[in-house]
A protein has these predicted regions:
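Short amphipathic alpha-helix that is part of the acyltransferase structural core
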Residues: 1-31, 36, 43
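Residues that cap or initiate secondary-structure elements
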Residues: 10, 82, 128, 184-186
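Short secondary-structure junctions and interdomain/linker hinges
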Residues: 24-28, 127-129, 185
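Acyl-donor binding region in acyl/amide transferases
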Residues: 33, 48-177
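Active-site beta-strand termini and strand-to-loop segments that position acidic
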Residues: 37-40, 180-182
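Conserved beta strand-loop-helix elements of the APE1-like EEP
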Residues: 175-186
């Protein structure tokens, strides 16, 4: 059985995966919830939901939202899963984990931040093909320009009081944009 367990960002398993991940993130900015992925008692990886991206092509039109609704969109900012003993425990495991995560983080996000989740977004860097998102019926809505941003020490004017953002407009890394509405579960009357 898939079991997602909320962890801190400093979880030793997560820190180890961050070093192996293709992006090698140093941390996460904004709001986020980290979840360890278990099947029965075996650890398979981590999945993290965080604040949505500020500027994302076609996202606002897809969800029919504006900036006031950004707190209701969760970005799948990190997903790293590895086989145990050379295999996954069940068929389509990565997609089933993604679905379980969507269901669980919608509840966890509301409890932690007080915001009802209306949808999800994820940015996939080629050559990755987003197959697991396609199997989970996410919609492809476009491609980013590929700008990257990192935080360094210092101060910045505006809404970001901690650290200074440094943008890279030259070494572009465009990403595929996938989104999905929250699925409304039918209730019995």
């Amino acid at each position: 059985m898939i079991n997602l367990v909320v962890t801190k960002r400093t979880d030793k398993n997560l820190l180890s995966l961050m070093k192996k991940h293709y992006r090698q993130p140093k941390g996460f900015v904004g709001r986020y919830i980290c979840s360890a992925i278990y099947y029965n008692f075996d650890y398979y990886g981590h999945i993290i939901g965080g604040s949505c991206t500020l500027n994302l092509p076609n996202r606002n039109q897809f969800f029919n939202i504006n900036k006031n609704n950004y707190k209701n969109i969760i970005n799948n900012i990190f997903y790293h899963i590895e086989k145990v003993n050379g295999k996954y425990p069940i068929r389509n495991f990565t997609t089933k984990v993604l679905k379980a995560w969507r269901d669980k983080i919608s509840i966890d996000w509301k409890k932690k931040y007080g915001d009802k989740v209306i949808g999800f977004e994820s940015l996939i860097e080629p050559p990755r093909t987003a197959d697991l998102y396609k199997k989970d019926k996410w919609s492809y809505i476009g491609r980013t320009k590929g700008y990257t941003c990192k935080r360094v020490s210092g101060r910045e004017k505006g809404v970001f009081p901690y650290g200074k953002r440094v943008w890279n407009y030259k070494n572009l890394r465009p990403k595929l944009v996938f989104v999905k509405h929250v699925e409304i579960k039918a209730t019995k009357d």
